[in-house]
Amino acid sequence: MNSTPDTFQRPALRELTPLEARVLGVLIEKQHTVPDTYPLSLNALTAGCNQKTARSPVMNVSEAEVLTAIDGLKRLSLASEGSSSRVPRFEHNMNRVLGIPSQAAALLTMLLLRGPQTAAELRLNSARLHGFADISSVEAFLDELAARTPPLVVKLPRAPGARESRWMHLMCGDVAPDEAPAHGAHEDAVPPSEFEALKAEQKALTAELAQLRALVEYMANELGIDVGKLTRGV
């Protein structure tokens, strides 16, 4: 930290599209989590954008759409294409372009990928990118990102019934607090078909458990064993 006001003054970038933000976040995340395959191929980058976990909202985009987003990030110098491989591979330049340290980049990445989060959630979710000692250190870097001109993040008003305020990124432009996604609204939602399957499985397991209990009682009676004493550990 210990940033001076001068380091906050950076040329303003245009607002990113939601897919550009997702692509940028994936590039930064995978640099840390799968360094052996970084820079990323188009196929790997698209798969990262379409992940069903650790993403909010969940997307389903094509390689052509990802390429368009990459072109947009290239024009902003936020991404570039490597030249050392026969297969096109892509990498990010966010830390250099925005002039932010790796700790702040880790937090911004999680906001790009997962949407609004509390400082505690950000500390947990960013652990693979950077290990923060405590929530106070997370909040300190968030405060620095919010103090930049223009700001990169904003602290949202605490929602009714919530214990903590959430933070969200501003890379896609300003968002009114009432337009921010509801907490957990897109996180790992269970499709109706899967929910019905889980209910059916629970029902089958309950019936199987009842049959097993009946069998145990029958065998205990045949052997003259008091089942009640067994369940009490006697």
Curated annotation (Swiss-Prot):
Q: Report any Pfam family annotated for this entry.
A: DUF480
Q: Which family does it belong to?
A: Belongs to the UPF0502 family.
Task: Quote the protein name from its UniProt record.
Answer: UPF0502 protein BPSS1373
